A protein has these predicted regions:
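Paired acidic/hydrophobic, glycine-rich loop segments that form the ligand-binding mouth/hinge
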Residues: 69-73, 204-205, 221-226
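Early extracytoplasmic/lumenal segment of secretory-pathway proteins
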Residues: 18-84
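Conserved C-terminal helix/tail region of periplasmic/extracytoplasmic solute-binding proteins
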Residues: 213, 321-352
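A bilobed periplasmic-binding-protein/Venus flytrap-type ligand-binding module shared by bacterial periplasmic
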Residues: 128-133, 175-178, 258-270, 289
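Periplasmic-binding protein-like
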Residues: 100, 189-198, 204, 242-263
């Protein structure tokens, strides 16, 4: 009898050990609460690994990182992943909640026909700021000048950070000059690069990892960051009852927008569980938690009734038609332009 019990325990342990889903996703996107809800439903374990930029994600995968089931790249990262033969085509028949996604987020240049990806949220790259300091200094956070104009930056020198991400920072500089965030024009790239070089001495750091905290505690006054991260910084400062308030806003020159999508790795150890997870995240109530908990924009129409009312008036979360017209989705630039941007970034970082 004891032998049978021991065998049962061993078999159960092995079964449970195999029922693991490996998630490779952005920092600060899906809350622990949502992950635990999925684990309870599927009676499985989710092991998550995080990254702070697409460059970091692609570098890890290029270096041979494996064993992931579901990944959550920005849309402009899908094309490189397909070219690297790292994704499997999706079986739409297994995704019964796919119908919930707003058609305007489907069938994009990044993935025509959504053969490989399903959008689950979006973020806007914009300015987050300390309301008290910005008001005191008479600065305008609705213009990219607060990040790129040396005359403006002189008032907040050492109190500004930008993402450590060439795709986002160069795109913002391009929009500042009225160019497309997806420009392939070498003259426009040079103008954006020169602007960043001129602004860099006034910045405290390139920071994609700790800028939420730095802004929320008052060490930094202005950041170029992601809308969902800045939602968290605003919430953290409020919860901590700081003597100042944090806010974030769109820029009048326009902003880059990135939709994040679920994909399944070509060598996924547990593809069945991957489909189950994606379908779970496409349910209206579960998708809404990404917005309610993390402040991300929501392409899922079934989620909107469950989004907290006060968030529906935040332009970076639910933009109106006029605001949407100034949001530009970032796309893959192709190898040649990508190299040019990376070379420009190296010049910027090395101070050449």
């Amino acid at each position: 009898m004891k032998k049978w019990l021991l065998l049962l325990v061993l078999v159960s342990s092995v079964t449970y050990a195999k029922n693991v889903m490996h998630l490779f996703n952005w920092n600060n996107t899906i809350s622990d609460e949502t992950i635990k809800a999925f684990e309870a439903q599927c009676k499985c374990e989710v092991k998550a690994t995080y990254y702070g930029s697409m460059e970091e994600m692609l570098a890890k995968l290029s270096a041979g990182a494996k064993g992931y089931d579901v990944m959550g790249p920005a849309n402009y990262g899908i094309t490189p992943l397909v070219k690297m033969n790292l994704l499997q085509k999706l079986d739409a028949s297994k995704l019964t909640n796919l119908k919930n996604i707003d058609p305007k987020f489907m069938n994009t240049v990044a993935d025509p026909g959504n053969q490989y990806s399903v959008p689950f949220d979006f973020s806007v790259t914009l300015v987050g700021y300390n309301q008290n300091k910005v008001k005191e200094l008479g600065l305008d956070p609705t213009s990219w000048a607060i990040v790129f104009d040396p005359e403006v930056l002189a008032k907040i020198k050492g109190r500004v950070t930008v993402l450590d991400d060439p795709r986002e920072v160069i795109a913002a500089a391009l929009r500042y000059h009225g160019f497309s965030a997806n420009s392939t024009d070498s003259a426009e790239l040079k103008q954006a690069t020169d602007t960043i070089k001129a602004a860099k001495p006034y910045w405290a750091a390139f920071n994609s990892q700790s800028y939420i905290r730095e802004l929320a505690v008052g060490n930094i006054w202005v950041v170029l960051g992601y809308s969902n991260d800045l939602y968290q910084a605003k919430s953290d400062a409020k919860k901590a009852k700081r003597a100042f308030s944090i806010d974030y806003t769109l820029q009048k020159e326009g902003n880059g927008m990135t939709a994040d999508s679920f994909v399944i790795a070509k060598d996924a150890p547990n593809p069945a569980l991957a489909y189950q997870f994606i379908n779970f995240m496409l349910e209206g109530k579960n998708a809404a938690q990404i917005t309610n908990n993390m402040g991300a924009g929501m392409p899922n129409r079934a989620a909107l009734p469950f989004v907290r009312q006060e968030l529906k008036s935040v332009p970076a979360i639910v933009p109106n038609a006029q605001q949407s017209a100034k949001l530009e989705q970032l796309v893959d630039l192709g190898p040649k332009t990508r190299r040019a941007w990376n070379n420009a970034w190296t010049e910027i970082k090395l101070g050449k």
